[in-house]
Amino acid sequence: MKVLVVGGGGREHAIVQKLRESREITALYCAPGNGGIARDAVCVPIKATDVEAIADWAAAEKMDYVVVTPDDPLCLGLVDLLAARGIPAFGPDRAAARIEGSKVFAKDLMRRYGIPTARYETFDDVEAALAYVRTAPCPVVVKADGLALGKGVLICETNAQAEEAVTEMMRHGKFGASGSRVVVEAFLEGPEVSVLCFTDGTAIRPMAASMDHKRALDGDRGLNTGGMGVIAPNPYYTPEVAARCMEEIFLPTLAAMRAEGCPFHGCLYFGLMITRDGPKVIEYNCRFGDPETQAVLPLMESDLLTVMRATTEGTLSQADVRFRDGASCCVVLASGGYPEKYETGKPIAGLAEAEKTARVYHAGTKALEDGTLVTSGGRVLGVTAVADDLPAAIRLAYEAADHIRFDGLHRREDIGARALRALG
């Protein structure tokens, strides 16, 4: 089979490497890919958001299957364009991708179908939003309705901070059209759990639960990022919690999407908070998480392509979906200044040493004509180690990461610390 993966980050590198294990694949491509992915697949220089060009290329090159993982092309309807050309794809169509593409759609869906989530209000008028947040009990969470690279969620400790967040989004256009509507919701307390699930719209198969570390600095301080590291499995996702999530959240969400006329197939990501009242949904994503994927897929024992095709063909209930015992830890190495302004073009050293004991997934890297690998993004690399237990996985990931050097390198030093405390 000829398979195309759409995207160019660390998540796509992890997916490409896992797909390489499949005996069915005869040719593997990635659009646009990056400097590391180029070692594992043929990179095609088309932006992931240029959905018409990708669909045309896939048809011209007779792709047998396309894996669409970034949120933008999913919300722009790439899966629909591929279907119109007779090409099966992994991922939801445009209508189903609204579960991530619009937080208003997602919150209203949960309210209509009784899926547990935080209390909230939605606003498309800036003055009404400002009037509400001036007196709302704090802390409060202000969310841009649309896609914002994982940075459109602001936790506001005071009413003044909430007013500033609303003003920046709705009046000053911080996130463009994505912030023209906002969701203002109650702040939930408890440990966070990320659960990626394969689904064909009816059957659902959760992957190993993980714990993301979204803040830029140690101790969960600093700005929200796309994610600075992940551990799996998540110790807060106990068998009891998992059973409640399946009954109260996972299956009802799939049923709700079917009832709305937009059944979801692909990877559905549940961002959960384990509160004193039980698990509640913080957010849905319509695709694999980044960097959760870089920690979860190394634990997967099944053939990834076979499982993906089962979600497309509606046969997931018969698919073999297995994850090994043990644990994994992914430490993200970022450019100094991320998630705000940062410099690129910094030469990267030490990869060969790191790769002796860990997987190194490339996110923001580029290969120059002379073969030199340089930084090209905010999150540059993800270093993942797998071991029999979590303490060993964390130690191995940091030991491998210590070998890697580039000017301005920033990382968190406490990935997995909260999970270790939970384990005692």
Language model segments and positions:
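Short acidic-hydrophobic, aromatic-tinged amphipathic segments that line or gate anion-handling sites
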Residues: 43-49, 121-125, 156
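Generic C-terminus detector
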Residues: 365-370, 374-424
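Solvent-exposed alpha-helices and their adjacent loops that cap or buttress functional pockets
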Residues: 21, 36-38, 60, 90, ...
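A conserved helix-loop-beta module that forms one wall/lid of the active-site cleft
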Residues: 90-152
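ATP-binding N-terminal substructure of ATP-dependent carboxylate-amine bond-forming enzymes
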Residues: 1-95
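Internal nucleotide-binding/catalytic subdomain
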Residues: 152-293
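Active-site "cap" helix and flanking loop/linker of ATP-utilizing ligase/carboxylase catalytic domains
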Residues: 246-268, 285-357, 368
